[in-house]
Amino acid sequence: MQDVETYLSTAPVLATLWFGFLAGLLIEINRFFPDALVFPSL
């Protein structure tokens, strides 16, 4: 079990999980608020 915890705490694994979570969050926000990522004033 110690080896699994060590593996999951490495930088590439944490980065993959973080960016996957962030991408999913942005996709869901863009689904409910489709114009939020577009700046109409520009």
Curated annotation (Swiss-Prot):
Q: Where does the chain cross the membrane?
A: 7-27
Do you know which Pfam families this protein is assigned to? PSI_PsaJ
Question: What species is this protein from?
Answer: Huperzia lucidula (Shining clubmoss)
Cited SUPFAM superfamilies = Subunit IX of photosystem I reaction centre, PsaJ
Q: Which UniProt keywords apply?
A: Chloroplast, Membrane, Photosynthesis, Photosystem I, Plastid, Thylakoid, Transmembrane, Transmembrane helix
Q: What does this protein do?
A: May help in the organization of the PsaE and PsaF subunits.
Where mainly found? Answer: plastid
Coiled-coil residue windows: none
- One cellular component (GO) term of this entry: chloroplast thylakoid membrane
Membrane topology category: Single-pass membrane protein
Which InterPro entries does the record cross-reference, listed alphabetically? PSI_PsaJ, PSI_PsaJ_sf
Q: Which family does it belong to?
A: Belongs to the PsaJ family.
- Specify the protein name: Photosystem I reaction center subunit IX
Which PANTHER family would you find in this protein's record?
PHOTOSYSTEM I REACTION CENTER SUBUNIT IX (PTHR36082:SF2), PTHR36082
Q: Specify whether NADP is a keyword of the entry.
A: no
Localization terms from the record: Plastid, Chloroplast thylakoid membrane
